[in-house]
Design a protein with these regions (language model features):
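Bacterial N-terminal signal peptides that target proteins for export
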Residues: 1-9
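Short clusters of hydrophobic/aromatic residues that line enzyme substrate/ligand-binding pockets
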Residues: 57, 97, 163
Length: 181
């Protein structure tokens, strides 16, 4: 009798564990999809005068307690996460989004986790000696990254005029961070 109870308890714990793992996976997928819906809904937002301003841009900046006129790519990322109750640093400073605990991929590393939808990318600028542009990954391949990013333009500038869908080369990406875990 004791042996059958022991087997039953282990079987029950195994099933509960599978159920928990599956619900965690499903929950993350739902959150990623909601985040993606939010960032894609912003494609087409443009600055009012080309000076980091306009109703939507100022909303992104306010989320991070920044005034009109500040660069806003990181604020856009934080605002989107915030709209979906994803914990984030609420910062307009790109390096704040790439703390080691959140970084899952870095250029030239052998220990990378494959980036996925709703992760964020960072581009390093040697003249600034830091990551100075960020946005969302919508699709990742070995050679290309489909993105949605704020404060860019058709040419891919880090000081742009709106929210755009872009295709970047994977080799342009310096780091990837994951906030949906």
């Amino acid at each position: 009798m004791a042996k059958s109870n022991y087997v039953f308890i282990h079987l029950l714990l195994y099933c509960v564990g599978l159920s928990y793992a599956q619900s965690s996976y499903t929950s993350n997928t739902i959150i990623r999809n909601k985040v993606a819906l939010t960032y894609t809904s912003q494609i087409g937002v443009r600055e009012l005068t080309g000076n980091n301003d306009g109703k939507a841009v100022e909303t992104y900046l306010r989320y991070c307690d920044l005034p009109k006129g500040e660069p806003w790519c990181a604020s856009f990322v934080c605002w989107v996460y915030g709209k979906n109750n994803v914990t984030n640093p609420r910062s307009g400073f790109c390096p704040d989004l790439f703390q080691q605990k959140n970084t899952v991929w870095t250029r030239n590393s052998n220990h990378n986790i494959t980036p996925t939808r709703a992760d964020i990318f960072g581009i390093y600028f040697p003249n600034k000696k830091r990551i100075a542009h960020t946005g969302f990954i919508d699709k990742w391949t070995s050679t290309q990254v489909h993105t949605v990013e704020g404060n860019t333009n058709q040419a891919g500038s880090r000081e742009g005029d709106g929210v755009y869908r872009k295709i970047r080369l994977t080799r342009q990406i310096y780091a990837v961070a994951r906030f949906i875990k």
